[in-house]
Amino acid sequence: MVLESIARVIKVQLPAYLKRLPIPDSIAGFIRLTVSEWLRLLPFLGVLALLGYLAIRPFLPKKKQQKDSLINLKIQKENPKVVNEINIEDLHLAKAAYCRCWRSKTFPVCDGSHNKHNELTGDNVGPLILKKKEV
């Protein structure tokens, strides 16, 4: 039953539909088409456009995919939440930079790894900088 229906569509209904389409003999004939004729052509042209897109899609450039979707790739993965506590009195330097990108090999201190991460992903992450206030 299903195959008979498909055969009927392909052998009878599709050719009849294509014969009724107002396809002009020349390109200039498209200018003379009326609005109702354009509306009758619309489904056919839509199917042609879809088939054309599907045919050229493998040759279109791929979108740049993000290298990794996780933020923290390797630091303290055994913990459900990574927390680093730093006592303010322990800041001996006038300025300290702490990592926010999770790529630093000296985590929690920033080593500039965010620069490579930003280039690869288009992100704009930077370090957390703590400075002593001048009195």
Curated annotation (Swiss-Prot):
Residues 1-37 are lumenal. It is a single-pass membrane protein. GO terms for molecular function: 2 iron, 2 sulfur cluster binding; metal ion binding; protein homodimerization activity. It holds the Pfam family MitoNEET_N. It is found in: Endoplasmic reticulum membrane; Mitochondrion outer membrane. Residues 61-135 are cytoplasmic. It comes from the Eukaryota. Binds 1 [2Fe-2S] cluster. One of its GO terms (biological process) is regulation of autophagy. Keywords: 2Fe-2S, Autophagy, Endoplasmic reticulum, Iron, Iron-sulfur, Membrane, Metal-binding, Mitochondrion, Mitochondrion outer membrane, Transmembrane, Transmembrane helix. GO terms for cellular component: endoplasmic reticulum membrane; mitochondrial outer membrane. The chain crosses the membrane at residues 38-60. InterPro entries: CISD1/2 (IPR045131), FeS-contain_CDGSH-typ (IPR018967), FeS-contain_mitoNEET_N (IPR019610), MitoNEET_CISD (IPR042216). [2Fe-2S] cluster binds at residues 99, 101, 110, 114. Its main location: endoplasmic reticulum. Homodimer. Regulator of autophagy that contributes to antagonize becn1-mediated cellular autophagy at the endoplasmic reticulum. Participates in the interaction of bcl2 with becn1 and is required for bcl2-mediated depression of endoplasmic reticulum Ca(2+) stores during autophagy. This is CDGSH iron-sulfur domain-containing protein 2. The lineage of its organism: Eukaryota, Metazoa, Chordata, Craniata, Vertebrata. The gene is cisd2.
